[in-house]
Curated annotation (Swiss-Prot):
GO terms for biological process: chaperone cofactor-dependent protein refolding. The keyword Cytoplasm applies. One of its GO terms (cellular component) is cytoplasm. HAMAP family: CH10. This is Co-chaperonin GroES. It comes from the Bacteria. Belongs to the GroES chaperonin family. Heptamer of 7 subunits arranged in a ring. Interacts with the chaperonin GroEL. GO terms for molecular function: ATP binding; metal ion binding; protein folding chaperone; protein-folding chaperone binding; unfolded protein binding. Keywords: Chaperone, Cytoplasm. CDD domains: cpn10 (cd00320).
Length: 96
């Protein structure tokens, strides 16, 4: 299934998170934190400015990003895989 986000929305695939603590203990369930890194798999056309112009997004498909996993992040299933839909403003950094 193809998906195209609107405006300043970005669709991410969450990166796999290590499930061991620094001391080597295997973490399960709620003890294992979800990663706040992801790969951009789709981007919208851009943010609509007050004057009506569209400003292109700073992130692009294939970027690895660090994001704020809080209010406003929507989780959906796409072809059996979990994806996240969020605004570009919820992205904190691009990993280079």
């Amino acid at each position: 299934m193809a998906i195209r986000p609107l405006h300043d929305r970005v669709i991410l695939k969450r990166a796999e998170q290590e499930s061991k603590s620094a001391g080597g203990i295997v973490l399960t369930g709620s003890a294992a934190e979800k990663s706040t890194r992801g790969e951009v798999i789709a981007v919208g056309n851009g943010r609509i400015l007050e004057n009506g112009e569209v400003k292109a997004l700073d992130v692009k498909v294939g970027d690895t990003v660090i994001f704020n996993d809080g209010y406003g992040v929507k989780t959906e299933k796409l072809d059996g895989e979990e994806v996240l839909i969020l605004s570009e403003s919820d992205i904190l950094a691009i990993v280079e």
